[in-house]
Amino acid sequence: MGASYAVNTIAEDVHARLQEITAGFGPDVIIEAVGSPVTYQMAVNEVAFTGRVICIGYAKTEVSFQTKFFVQKELDIRGSRNAQPSDFRAVIRYLERGTCPVDRLISREVTPEEAPQAMQQWSENPGKVFRILVRFN
């Protein structure tokens, strides 16, 4: 099992690309893994009628929806927070391929000594800090 397509939301017109890929219907399944209010809303707006949105990204700020889409489109929205070891291995292989824009996913790199202060800043500004990478040498 795997994704048939991946769409770069920064480099592509998401709506146009999804319409092209799906002959105008929208994707049957969208996996929201970023945790941004924008990508959560995009997932609900772009998924096909009777489609499924899988939410694994953790939004750090409130996300607002027009709930009429849930009913009108008969959506199946699911959340998941658990992963198996094989899932982590798959993510590592994906990152090793170099196709993921990692620099856009990480707000800051810190040493273990700097981590407590960085986490405090993240806690105080959840909408401004996306991910913090603690680099061990």
Segments from the language model and where they lie:
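Glycine-centered, small-residue-biased loops immediately flanking beta-strands
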Residues: G51-R52, L75
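Rossmann-fold NAD(P)-binding glycine/threonine-rich loop
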Residues: G57-E74, S86-R93
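Conserved beta-strand segments of alpha/beta enzyme cores
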Residues: S4-Y5, D76, P101
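Short, acidic/turn-prone active-site loops that include or flank metal/cofactor-
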Residues: I10-V14, G57-T61, N82-A83
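Adenosine-nucleotide cofactor-binding segment
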Residues: M1-M42
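Glycine- and other small-residue-rich loops at beta-strand/loop junctions that grip anionic moieties
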Residues: V7, D28-A33, I56, S80, ...
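C-terminal hydrophobic helical "lid"/dimerization subdomain
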Residues: Q41-N45, P85-N137
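Helix-to-beta-strand junctions that scaffold the AdoMet/dcAdoMet cofactor pocket
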Residues: V47-F49
